[in-house]
Amino acid sequence: MSETEVPQNNIILASLDDLINWGRANSLWPMFFGLSCCFVEMMTSFTSRYDVSRFGAEVLRGTPREADLMVIAGTVFKKMAPSILRLYEQMAEPKWVISMGSCANSGGMYDVYSVVQGVNQIIPVDVHVPGCPPRPEAFLQGLMLLQEKIRREERPARKVLHLAGGSEGTTRPVLVDGVTKSRDTRGPGMEGIAIRGTSVQHPHFPMPRSDEMWRPPAPKHQFPDFGLAGELETAFGHRVVRDDHATDMLTYRCPPELLPDVLRHLKTRSAAPFRRLEDVACVDESCRRERSRFPDFTVNYHLLNFHIPGHLRIKAELRGDTPEIPSATSVFPAADWYEREAFDMYGIQFAGHPNLRRILMPPDWEGHPLRKNHPFRATEMHPYTTDDARRHQALPASDFFDRIDEETLILNLGPQHPGTHGIIRFVLKLDGEEIVDMDTDIGYHHRGAEKIGERQHWNQFIPYTDRIDYLAGVQNNLAYVNSVERLCGITVPDRGIAIRVMLAELFRIANHLVWLGTFAADVGAMTPVFYTFTDREKIFDIVEMVTGGRMHPSWFRIGGVADDLPEGWDGAVKAFLDWMPGRLKEYEDLLKGNPIFRERLKGVGVITGDEALEWGITGPNLRACGVEWDLRKKIPYNGYQHFHFEVPTEEGGDCWARYRVRIEEIRQSLHIVRQCWKEMPAGRWITDDYRYVLPKKRDALHDIESLIHHFINATRGMAPPKGENYSAIEAPKGENGYFVVSDGLNVPYRVRIKTPSFPHIQALPLMSRGWLVADFLAIIGSIDFVLADLDR
């Protein structure tokens, strides 16, 4: 019988359709692929509490050619989109796609220049799973919806038998932004309604009344002067002058041409040397309200002193559309990536920089995103399409090295690889299996968080901080609100401080548990990851009881926390404190005495204490080099000076030392949480300075002043005094700092985010040269980095 003679409603073909669909629906082969926060919740569904194996989809496939299901779990970045399309096209037919999370579905809260507004603009999608991020249960529901779609809608028998007609796999169209899908961030049907609100447009209106309101100046904090006044005058005369307007740290203004000499003096000749370059923070001053007081650009070099704990800021003022300043890389090697970022984001030229090229944006990107005249939103730009994804390809690996010998092998590890812990591209130059040199291509997870900070009011930005280090939860909130509170002079009540500390330390434990499980898997131990995710769920039960959220509670507020602790919190915390010490011993029994685990780590990826200081390494990775430095002790914040705990250190500077430090940090965090549980103060959980927070309802109902503040804060948001503040916290991965700049409005003028992952990955070649590729996976796993923390 010919193809045309086969009846459409053939009972044999229909039965065969049912049989094939039954097999395919119950044996989906998902690819090991993740983009951001949503992927962590997707992976949680593979653990014992949720058990995705019930649906026949528990084995993640390492390559697209072995997979038939692609889960787009997280934000789709324009730099990553070409790789997503390539992976999809390499999958064998039939194949299906689940879009998991608001960002994958539509761009979500990231309507920003670097993000594709929905993965269905480059590949077709079968099922959309809502949420930011979706819970594991939501992913399982999405999986069941896909199974139902396969069973009900597909007719594969004709395709299998090479007959005409039938259908299998994804058949839905790829959409075009603004043509076959809405470009309005609020969804379809809203095109005729004007966009309103500070969350969707820059809130500059002609002569708003709030601009005329008097505000007290930013309070001046106490900070060391390091004895620099006479020292700098002797060395540089009156060309380097103190900035008396600075309220957060000692600040000097320096002519651009003197910058390397000033930095070299501070690092090597000062009586109290500044050993570490903390950050390079640039500001485009072109939209200041008092424009005449400011240059076109300001470059801020933040330095750290270990002898007299404190920070120092060196400001250099630049003018013109193509400003230039000497590079600081000859003084601080860590300046390399920071200056490349400033060039990428602002177009500032650093004379003498050894490799000044883009670092976050694609190599063919037009413009500099953090300039005030660059578009904010993806929906203000040309729609991103499949053609764009095919046209904008990554640099070839050979472009990363000056010279490649005939016998040299170049290996691309990433941007999609199960061992890289996210979307990042390591380019390895090999002699056999030994790493001779390497370079790193980052920016595949760049979500434009700093640009977004310039269009949200001060409280609106808090949810975005959750998604920087998406494994650290409220630790991100704490870093941000701490800087804003210092700028405003806000005092947080004791109960609010204790609640913050308790939750921050619970998230430190949760972070280290995820790190421990995935790191053990990197070196061949599969059991710990299932144990650690189970214990992480116990922490999330507490977090959900207190905040209502899991990964991203967004629960800290400027001035305190969102609400008081609920009834029963103490019992839940006590149960966890009783459980976890024994569990930690079990982990050590599994790993510490394991000879394979030990040999894979001992002596591998060594970095010395001096090298760590030189390259800006912080947190557990610094303490694993024998340097006892923890901001909670050295520059206390949020009441940590009132808690008793030890700072664990190790001397090896290798993967083993990094493992040992984090295990001991879990113990110390448990000790801090126990103190919070035992000694939780009574009273308010948020400040009563209603200029900056919403008043309690009873105060707003009985006091006109409180009611006025309620109205102002609810309608336009609070407005800090003019000024700037940089402060950092001891986050789980290292030091996380926010440099916030206020022009006296209800939105930040500039939000600079200093993360630990950025300098740690920059220093990776130092730890990796001379080791094998297999050791390299252990080294990057031992560092503990997150791509959103790296790329922001």
Swiss-Prot record:
InterPro entries: NADH_DH_suC (IPR010218), NADH_Q_OxRdtase_suD (IPR001135), NADH_quin_OxRdtase_su_C/D-like (IPR037232), NADH_UbQ_OxRdtase-like_20kDa (IPR006137), NADH_UbQ_OxRdtase_30kDa_su (IPR001268), NADH_UbQ_OxRdtase_49kDa_CS (IPR014029), NADH_UbQ_OxRdtase_CS (IPR020396), NADH_UQ_OxRdtase_20Kd_su (IPR006138)
Record's bilayer topology term: Peripheral membrane protein
Reaction(s) catalysed by this chain's protein: a quinone + NADH + 5 H(+)(in) = a quinol + NAD(+) + 4 H(+)(out)
The keyword Membrane is assigned to this record: yes
Main location: membrane
Keywords in alphabetical order: Cell inner membrane, Cell membrane, Membrane, Multifunctional enzyme, NAD, Quinone, Translocase, Transport, Ubiquinone
Pfam families: Complex1_30kDa (PF00329), Complex1_49kDa (PF00346), Oxidored_q6 (PF01058)
EC number: 7.1.1.-
DNA repair is among the record's keywords: no
Region of interest called NADH dehydrogenase I subunit D, as start-end residue ranges on this chain: 412-792
GO MF annotation terms: 4 iron, 4 sulfur cluster binding; iron ion binding; NAD binding; NADH dehydrogenase (ubiquinone) activity; NADH:ubiquinone reductase (non-electrogenic) activity; quinone binding
GO CC list: plasma membrane
Superkingdom as given in the UniProt entry: Bacteria
Subcellular location: Cell inner membrane
Role noted for this protein: NDH-1 shuttles electrons from NADH, via FMN and iron-sulfur (Fe-S) centers, to quinones in the respiratory chain. The immediate electron acceptor for the enzyme in this species is believed to be ubiquinone. Couples the redox reaction to proton translocation (for every two electrons transferred, four hydrogen ions are translocated across the cytoplasmic membrane), and thus conserves the redox energy in a proton gradient.
Similarity-based family: In the N-terminal section; belongs to the complex I 20 kDa subunit family. In the central section; belongs to the complex I 30 kDa subunit family.
UniProt-recorded name of the protein: NADH-quinone oxidoreductase subunit B/C/D
Chain's gene name: nuoBCD
